[in-house]
């Protein structure tokens, strides 16, 4: 039985009707059938949940003004603004202090990739889902040319694109939803990609590359 650390940007047990939350919950319960899964995320308050083969711990989100500071800091470092918005020093500290206790670290969304431990030698899997840089670029094009929202989305698309390439370099495997998304990725990263559809039955494919890699 493998020990898996599963990092989410949001509480996967919140019953929130959101694609990333639903997808994360399905992954967690599928993985917990044959492994022990420790799940951590941000939430509105500190909380814990425990079942036979999984446990969950949430870390309270930082206040809005500190978030603004982290967002600005992300921009200064030429990184996506979302990394600052979803950053938690408590999660960063928890991962750095505990990752050695796990066989695999599973990151849900590029927003959690910033928690990859320094000098990490563990298998790290990133469920990217979609290439968000493409989504933001398309969203940007829908706004009037001089609309400041268009500028924000366009800049974020460039920052996310740069960060996606960073993730392709650093992670053992990258999960994407569709072949269309996979076709947009540079050829040198193709061997790191795996298509995992939204269906719960297809999530079991994840075990194959755990065994191969």
Label each residue range with its predicted role:
Residues 107, 176-177:
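Short beta-strand scaffold positions
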Residues 180, 199:
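Carbohydrate-associated surface elements
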Residues 95-113, 122-125:
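Short N-terminal targeting/anchoring amphipathic segment
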Residues 64-82, 124-162:
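Acceptor-binding helix/loop patch of EC 2.4 sugar-transfer enzymes
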Residues 42-93:
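A conserved catalytic-core segment of Leloir-type glycosyltransferases
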Residues 1-54, 100:
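N-terminal subdomain of nucleotide-sugar transferases
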Residues 5, 209-213:
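Conserved donor-binding/catalytic core segment of Leloir-type glycosyltransferases
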Residues 26-27, 89-96, 132, 149-174:
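Membrane-proximal helix-turn-helix segments that form the acceptor-binding/catalytic region
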């Amino acid at each position: 039985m493998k020990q898996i650390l599963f990092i989410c940007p949001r509480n996967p047990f919140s019953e929130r009707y959101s694609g990333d939350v639903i997808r994360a919950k399905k992954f967690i319960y599928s993985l917990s059938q044959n492994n022990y899964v420790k799940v951590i995320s941000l939430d509105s308050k500190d909380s814990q949940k425990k079942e036979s083969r999984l446990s969950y711990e949430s870390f309270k989100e930082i206040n809005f003004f500190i978030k603004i500071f982290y967002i600005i800091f992300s921009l200064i470092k030429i990184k996506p603004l979302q990394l600052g918005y979803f950053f938690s020093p408590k999660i960063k500290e928890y991962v750095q202090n505990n990752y050695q206790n796990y066989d695999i670290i599973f990151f849900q969304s590029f927003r959690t990739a910033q928690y990859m431990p320094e000098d990490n030698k563990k298998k790290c899997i990133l469920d990217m889902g979609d290439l968000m840089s493409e989504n933001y670029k398309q969203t940007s094009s829908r706004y009037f040319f001089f609309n400041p929202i268009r500028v924000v989305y366009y800049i974020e698309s460039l920052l996310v694109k740069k960060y996606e390439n960073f993730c392709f370099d650093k992670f053992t495997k990258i999960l994407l939803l569709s072949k269309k998304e996979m076709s947009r990725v540079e050829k040198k990263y193709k061997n790191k990609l795996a298509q995992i559809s939204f269906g719960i039955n297809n999530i079991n494919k994840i075990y194959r590359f755990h065994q191969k890699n």
